[in-house]
Amino acid sequence: LFKGTDKIGTVDYAKEKPWLDSIAAKYDILAETKDANKRNIIQKDINRLSIKAGEYAIPNEFSSLITSFGGTGLNAFTSFDETVFHNSFSPQYIHQWCELNSERLMSPVFRLFQGELETVYEEKNMYSDNMLMQPAEDAESKIFAGTPYAYSIIGSTENLKNPRLGEMKEFYNKYYVANNMTLILTGDVNADSISNILENTFGRIRSGKVEKEQPFNLKPLKDLATMKLKLPIPIVKAGGIVYRAPIDRDSDYNAFTVALGLLNNSSETGLLDSLRNDNKVMYAIAMMSPFKETNVVGVGFVPNIPFGSRKKAERMCVEQIEKLKKGDFSDDFLNSTKLLLEKDAQENLENIDNRANIMTTAASHGLSWKNVLDKGKDIAAVSRE
């Protein structure tokens, strides 16, 4: 949604639209065509139509308008649970910012699509260059089999070869409705003073029927076979163990957060940290993937190189996890870890970018702001029991 609307990003939308409609129709035909020669002819036709449509486009006009009103960092990202459009701006331009962004969401036009598709290809190639990306996606496809989390966010090469602008528009019409979106503002904002501005701008966005999310059941990890993933790193060996974990709406999530902090933390005083600090392994870490509907914690380890044993490294990590399960740690260690986690939670709220991310996750996952503010207190209340 960066290419403008029927009012932004075009010199004459009435003349541009027939060309855009023709391009959309051609992409839908391309997706149905398997013959390489026929595909080549269609792609050349798309290129010809795109050149004609481009005569009416004003590239980056939306971005330029945002910048002219003090906006910076205009960007977006898609995760497994949400798509987020974001930027910073000067508060004195709140009215202009609301006008532009509400207009953007009300009537987007998917122009300059050919160039945008090339950008997505470049992004996918960039991910492919990350040697850990493919093993991670392979693991996720097994761990989250049968759920949307099993699929790559950016899609497969086959998906990108056969885009359908018609399906994109259907997706927009279905999901980009007021009751399926959240507006998040953080910084120098007085909610009472801007409520009328918000109502007169974002209040124009249509509502729609939002399907209730269906719960899904994941297979117990013990029923999954051991996976062997090849990392393209000479000499270095690595391994990992994955556990199911509570989600952030569960009553035991804060206790789990403390348990994870006892394994490793920002001060590197955890039970797994000690393995690395004592040079018993090259690397050991426990990290969670807190999705909205499920959560897993992965314990990753790298034995010392060049002759360290992967089995021995795994055994030492499991021993540290067993210590945690048995409560084989001091009260001082527990209390200092809780204090560290409380401090981290508070400091995250003091940084505007971190706070925006926390607010986004809370809104997406159905958490109240009170849940967020009480996190430090809830962590402090966690006991050994």
What are the residue ranges of the model-derived segments?
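M16 family metallopeptidases and their MPP-like homologs
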Residues: L1-E103, Q134-E158, N180-T186, V236-I247, ...
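Non-catalytic, conformational "gating/processing" segments within enzyme and secreted inhibitor domains
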Residues: F110, Q114-E118, L132, A136, ...
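Short, charged, amphipathic alpha-helices and their helix-cap/turn boundaries
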Residues: L160-R164
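Short, glycine/charge-rich beta-strand/loop segments that flank catalytic centers
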Residues: F80-T83, Q114-M126
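Short, surface-exposed beta-strand/loop micro-motifs that present aromatic residues
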Residues: K169-K174, D223-L231, M288
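An aromatic/glycine/proline-enriched structural segment found at the starts
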Residues: R104, P108-R111, N125-S128, A145-I153, ...
